[in-house]
């Protein structure tokens, strides 16, 4: 019989640090569980160490209940692997509407097993000899003679890519000064997030996809 664990590592993305500290501070004394965490950018690795398996379980369940949307995995699970798993589970295809988004996602997903089943790596979308120009044409047609700013064009491209390819999700990216504006289009609507160019935009975009 396998020995029950008294320690684990939880992985979160986008969890507010103040709320995380508050949640750990509310652990019941009888759980006899200590927590340490380290954050970089939006990602947090949180290590739990308990005196007993039951204490560990209760502490982990408490965090899961409070940070359900932010908690993406445990142990060695990467955010990219969590995204591929979510896409597979919901039978969704993800494409990119421009090379900038492709560069962010392809480097993260190329080594994840099964990624080719749920992500086109540009083959059906922006890098396709016919679909790519079609996406650009459809996107610019929305503005007629007007020259759109980079963010509006990225949003229009993402919406066009989803329709041209017939995918459930389409991601885009635009530069705006010292920032990157990340775009995600789905049948439900569109999401935008602005991150500093110095931040890891690929991880923020992956998190948007995971939550969609």
Q: Which sequence ranges carry the predicted segments?
A:
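Short glycine-/aliphatic-rich beta-strand segments at the starts of folded cytosolic domains
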Residues: 2-17
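A generic structural signal for well-ordered coil/turn residues at beta-strand boundaries
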Residues: 4-6, 31, 42-44, 178
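Beta-strand secondary-structure signal
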Residues: 9, 45-47, 181
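Short amphipathic alpha-helix segments
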Residues: 13-34
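Short alpha-helical segments enriched in small residues
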Residues: 26-27, 54-212
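Short beta-strand
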Residues: 35-40
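A generic structural motif
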Residues: 42-52
